[in-house]
């Protein structure tokens, strides 16, 4: 398998996860990130929806407020030490409030990126680089989403 094939497979897997994330967001899921740059990266990737910054309030109060919304919760914190701790703590709080948060997308992105990136804000740049390396362009789903964002 050539490097291009490896990059192509990685790009396909990331785009599948982004599509899954986009569909969840359209159904009303709340996406929890750490910072404003994370939101910007997600929007550049065509993800529209409700984003919440986990770092603006106490985690207990934040989790209680988001849990009271009664919607699906997707935790998309960075995969550095701080992000791992934050994801674990948020998950614990949400479960105490009766909400089972989705950590699968975060965990799969962490695995796929193979330590080439460690945060959500770098995801757009990483995907762009993979597209250049593989000769791919934005797929029509993301082009459509980006057109609405402009």
From Swiss-Prot:
**Cofactor list:** Mg(2+)
PROSITE patterns in the record? TOPRIM
Do you know which InterPro entries this protein is assigned to? Answer: TOPRIM_dom, TOPRIM_RNase_M5-like, UPF0292
Instruction: Please tell me where Mg(2+) 2 binds in this chain.
Output: 78, 80
What the entry lists under SUPFAM superfamilies is as follows: Toprim domain
Q: Which UniProt keywords apply?
A: Magnesium, Metal-binding
What Pfam families is this protein classified in?
Toprim
Record-annotated disulphide pairs: none
- Residue runs in coiled coils: none
Toprim domain residues are 28-109
Molecular function GO terms recorded: metal ion binding
Gene3D superfamilies xref list: 3.40.1360.10
Binding-site positions, Mg(2+) 1: 34, 78
What SMART domains does the entry give? TOPRIM (SM00493)
The record's comment on cofactor binding reads: Binds two Mg(2+) per subunit.
Which HAMAP family does the entry link to?
Answer: UPF0292
Q: What family classification does the UniProt entry report for this protein?
A: Belongs to the UPF0292 family.
| NCBIfam families named among the record's database cross-references | PRK04017.1-2
Q: What protein name is recorded for this chain?
A: UPF0292 protein MM_0821
Organism per entry: Methanosarcina mazei (strain ATCC BAA-159 / DSM 3647 / Goe1 / Go1 / JCM 11833 / OCM 88) (Methanosarcina frisia)
